[in-house]
Amino acid sequence: YKDQVAFFHGCFVNYNHPQLGKDLIKVLNAMGTGVQLLSKEKCCGVPLIANGFTDKARKQAITNVESIREAVGVKGIPVIATSSTCTFALRDEYPEVLNVDNKGLRDHIELATRWLWRKLDEGKTLPLKPLPLKVVYHTPCHMEKMGWTLYTLELLRKIPGLELTVLDSQCCGIAGTYGFKKENYPTSQAIGAPLFRHRRERRGSGHHRLRNLQMAD
C-alpha cells in the first residue's frame, strides 16, 4: 500500500479485544491504506498515572514518544489509535502531566475514527454494505474532552441502513481503574446509573449497544 499509518493498539486491543485491531486493519486496507505497528510500544501510562505511579508512567511515555517520533519524523506516517484514552494521553497528558516532550508529534496522532472521517471527506472511498441494525451509542469521556465525538457519529451515519441513537453524554462511572476497586464500587455504580438505565430502556426496544468505551476511557 502506498499510503501507510502506524497503529497504536494499546492494552485493550492487545490483551482484551484483538479482533478490534484486526477489523480496523481490514477497514484501512479496504480504503487502500497499509498498517504498521510502532517499533516499540508500551502501555500509554494512564493506569499508572491514575494510581500515582508517575515515574513509571513517564518511562513508558518516553519509550512511546521515541517510537512515535520514528514513525512521524523518519517514516513520515501518522499514528492512529482506537482508544480515546490512549489518544488523549499521547497528545495531551504526556506534556501536561508527565512533562514528556511530544513537540511536533501531537498533530500527527489521531483517533482512528477521526482519521477515517477526514480521509472520506477528502475523497477516499470505502465500500460499505447495508447494515439494517438499530444501535445506541455512548460517547466516552476522553473523546468528549478532545471534542472529537462528531467524527465518530458522522462516520457511523455513513453506514447504509444503520439506525443510530446517541445517548446523552454521561460518564459510565468506570473512570479507568477507579471502578475496579472494591471501595469505589458504590460510587462508580451511582455515577453510571443514569447511563445504565437509558441503555436498558433502549435494549427493550430492540437496540444494540455500540460504544468506543475501553477499559481506561
Task: Set out the residue ranges of the language-model regions.
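Iron-sulfur cluster-binding electron-transfer modules in prokaryotic oxidoreductases
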Residues: 1-217
